[in-house]
């Protein structure tokens, strides 16, 4: 499964460039299902999840070609409306093929999704919304079988929670449905906004992106388009925290600091000096961070996918911090690994109480998911001695060249496969 070996104590200095946003690229790849022809995406990250989505699209009938960060997807006239378990179980984002397949083919067979096991991730909102649009479902041996005998029709759908995945699925279905779909309490994430831009470039009519109410008007004459994926704010945030935890001086380029307002504000509260421009940010970390409290919330709140990295930072703060996780009930599974390194963290329901210590100690740990794996690497950068992070295939799902980028900024880090 591979290991990352870190000799801690180096202060990171230098510049790192981030790639395209994983959480935008995956859904924009799926948009190719909607219409036959050759689609082009630029700034696509070279990560395992993108490769997995490519395998899924190939199974459905698409042909893919990649050159650098540019990806071409050729969608055929006839699709195989099936997403098999061996692909879907590895990545929860694959559930978003459900809506487009129903819209394009009138049927879909999708195994239930996997990916990072972060507790209860019901897809009820996806199904309820698609049912309001005319779909019907049944579950057979772990495979969700959907039909839209008369096609999908627009509807007003109110989400009980601003789910990113449900919003995306209903957007993708809505652009190929008949009539207007209104999504109330829609997710507002930047990746939703970017997906709307991509769909509009294909000839769709999506308005209200970035607000709680999305209007999607079905368009019969969609066509392939070229689109450039937005920068990955989670990769940018991870490197910013890497600079902070090492007391370093790190400049992140190719990013959008405006998409990290809450997270950068919390880094400032922790004692970091933050400077930023239109497409760059610079973090100068303190010798020891100040304790802070934060709560994870849907955008524009603090992103749950930067929670573990920030907790790693707070394990060496000069006091006690409290972190509240409101989105995923199993997000704290990594805490036991940080405790092996000497962190003092106690969990009470969805709250973590972090009592900062002056230093951590390197030891063998296992990455339980993408962001927790990144957090353990950051902890290893700060720890005394050697840290060995196992199960790094999780990290590969969301980061391209993490080891090389950290080494270029002075980290004593290597990978063993």
Segments and roles (model prediction):
Residues 1-417:
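Short, structured segments at the rim of ligand-binding sites
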């Amino acid at each position: 499964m591979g290991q990352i070996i870190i000799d801690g104590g180096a202060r990171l200095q230098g510049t790192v460039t981030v790639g395209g946003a994983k959480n935008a690229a995956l859904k924009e790849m799926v948009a190719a299902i909607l219409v036959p022809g050759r689609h082009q995406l630029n700034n696509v990250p070279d990560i395992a999840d993108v490769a997995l989505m490519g395998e899924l699209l190939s199974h459905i009938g698409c042909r893919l070609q990649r050159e650098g960060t540019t990806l071409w997807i050729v969608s055929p006239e006839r699709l195989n409306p099936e997403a098999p378990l061996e692909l879907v179980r590895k990545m929860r984002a694959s559930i978003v093929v459900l809506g487009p397949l129903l819209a394009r083919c009138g049927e879909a067979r999708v195994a239930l999704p996997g990916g990072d096991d972060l507790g209860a991730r019901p897809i009820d909102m996806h199904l309820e919304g698609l049912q309001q649009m005319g779909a019907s479902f049944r579950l057979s041996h772990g495979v969700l079988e959907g039909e839209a005998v008369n096609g999908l029709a627009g509807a007003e759908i109110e989400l009980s929670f601003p789910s990113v995945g449900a919003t995306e699925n209903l957007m993708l279905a809505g652009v190929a449905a008949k009539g207007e779909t209104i999504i109330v309490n829609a997710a507002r994430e930047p990746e939703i906004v970017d997906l709307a831009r991509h769909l509009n470039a294909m000839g769709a009519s999506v308005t209200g992106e970035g607000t709680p109410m999305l209007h999607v008007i079905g368009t019969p004459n969609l066509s392939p388009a070229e689109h450039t994926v937005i920068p990955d704010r989670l990769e940018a945030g991870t490197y910013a925290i890497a600079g902070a935890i090492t007391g370093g001086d790190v400049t992140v380029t190719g990013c959008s600091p405006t998409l990290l307002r809450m997270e950068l504000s919390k880094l400032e509260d922790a004692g970091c000096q933050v400077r930023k421009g239109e497409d760059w940010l610079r973090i100068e970390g303190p010798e020891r961070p100040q304790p802070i409290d934060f709560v994870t919330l849907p955008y524009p709140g603090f992103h749950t996918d930067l929670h573990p990295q920030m907790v790693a930072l707070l394990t060496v703060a000069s006091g006690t911090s409290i972190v509240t996780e409101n989105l995923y009930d199993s997000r704290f599974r990594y805490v036991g690994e940080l405790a092996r390194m000497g962190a003092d963290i106690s969990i009470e329901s969805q709250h973590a109480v972090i009592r900062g210590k002056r230093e951590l100690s390197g030891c063998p740990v296992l990455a339980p998911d993408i962001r927790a794996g990144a957090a353990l690497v950051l902890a290893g950068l700060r720890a005394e001695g050697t840290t060995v992070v196992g199960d790094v295939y999780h990290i590969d799902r969301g980061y391209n060249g993490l080891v090389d980028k950290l080494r270029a900024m002075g980290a004593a880090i290597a990978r063993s496969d």
